[in-house]
Amino acid sequence: MNLLYLGLLLFVTLLTTLYLASSKAIFAFSDWTFHAARVEEIYLNLKSGSFFTFIAARTFHNTGAASFLFYPYIFFYPWAFLRFILSPVNAFYAWYALVTFATATISYFSMKAYSKKSLASFIFSLVYTFAPYRLYLGGAVFGEYLAVIFLPLLFLGIYEVLWGDKKKWYLLAISGALVAYAHILSVFLSLEFAVILFIIKLITSRGISKDRIKSLLLSAGVCVFLVLPVIVPFFTDFIGQGLSSAKPSISYTMGPRYLLLNSFSAQKGWKLSFMLMLTILTAWAFIKSRRNWIIYGLGLFACFLTTRYFPWKLTAGTPFEMVQLTARYLSYASLFLTILLALGSSSVLEEHVTGRKKLALSCSLAVFMALFSLSSLSVYRDTLKHVQDMPKTSANSTQPAPFKRLRDYNYYNQFNYKILFGAFDYMPKSSLTSVQKQNSLLMHQAYLNGKTLTLSPLIKANQISYQVKSEKAADVDLPVIAYKHTTVSVNGQKHAFRRGNRGTVVVGLKRGQNTVTVGYKASPVFYLSIVISILSWLALLIYLVKFKAKYAQ
């Protein structure tokens, strides 16, 4: 049955993707320009023969912003590689399909390992993968979108360590690493629920065995080794460097009425589906096991966290402010409530349906979910028909990227606009003290001998060069951000520099024409972390092969 269900999941994936791709357009909204610029930088660096991307030399207005150091991007490589063989729009939709099918597949097998029921796993995968909130994430919010792939596997790993087969600790290590590769904030959110589950374990089991504690610590330790390349840059380049990050504050909470009423609409967005709302309203009458009561409680609590009824004001000044948008908890609400929906509905259906009827039922469920998803995506599709194409603007524009339509012919127009969200993330705090400073970076303005110069950059992978003519020996303040491992050369010779009041590179020049090149050289510790991570993955793979062989005996 696995092949049948995977085939049906692939069918729904392709149908929904082709529905969007047939528009031959993308709606650039929310975080789209931030992530699209990162993918473009990776693609162009790959094209020039550089595998690693550290700073934004070609995008982000050539400011050298280091979002690549502090915001994971490994799962953007498939999108970047697709750019070599497909047009920009088609490359995105091909990547979108890959991510969707990966979500469906991992969801299916995670639920299968938990429930041992194929039909329940199929229903879970359909509802979870094509949930309205996840469809919303797939339009632009790609960090969360990628993290959602691995949440079912992550919570399967937590379950195995705390209640199930503790020898499967590796599931938690692997899934935790994959979530970290996708979205650091999702690690924090997942940790919140992991702590809750740990407390529930202590209460319901009146403690926890030493063996389970060992498995928990082992999974955490291995996970750290796997994610070292993500962690190390924070120690080598962020801590103590006066850099900014995403603003830690709760900027939006939903009202319960908004969540309830919108969840009964068929459109994608900050909502649950009507199926999950019905699960909330009816599941309590059918739940019999303590385990399912725990799952139900977690689903309700996740919904509660999305609303303003939770005292979010009390979290001011705490790490919980990193959440920013409480709608992020909808992914967790969808996960827990979909488990109950899948278990309950599959039990009822399997009592009354067998043989060929079961095959027909599975196909019907796939068609229903496909139609439901197409309905959820219809507003987005209609928007693509009526919104205007993104117009051209100057290469050093300070105008924020508008919510407009991108096609292949105007795809590159977006990169001349100021990135709407995240343009100044991970820059020195001194860069952000005034709009004038920010705009001077976007407009490529340098300061020399009391004058303002507008320069044109010469670009290579992780490298930005400027031609600067000085009438006398003087310091020039370039529109490129200075980091701990920034490198500077003047006329081909390595040169000392300092950080100016814009957080930028300030370097002394001799009289005459000078070529100043600003680059980035990663710490040796970073490359060591990659080696350790790769060796850890290989060691884990060898362990799994031996474990499976022993388990089979």
Could you say what each language-model-derived stretch is?
Residues 1-18, 540-553:
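Start-transfer (signal-anchor) and selected internal transmembrane alpha helices
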Residues 8-9, 208-232, 294-301, 367:
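Hydrophobic alpha-helical membrane-interfacial segments at the cytosolic entry of transmembrane helices
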Residues 15-114, 119-152:
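Active-site lumenal/periplasmic loops and adjacent helix-entry segments of GT-C-fold
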Residues 154-168:
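Membrane-interface transmembrane helices that cradle and orient dolichyl/undecaprenyl
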Residues 157, 169-184, 219-225:
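Membrane-interface alpha helices of multi-pass inner-membrane proteins
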Residues 190-220:
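Perimembrane helix-loop-helix junctions
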Residues 225, 272-296, 300-301:
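Hydrophobic, aromatic-rich transmembrane alpha-helices
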Residues 429-553:
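Active-site-proximal, structured, solvent-exposed surfaces of multi-pass membrane proteins
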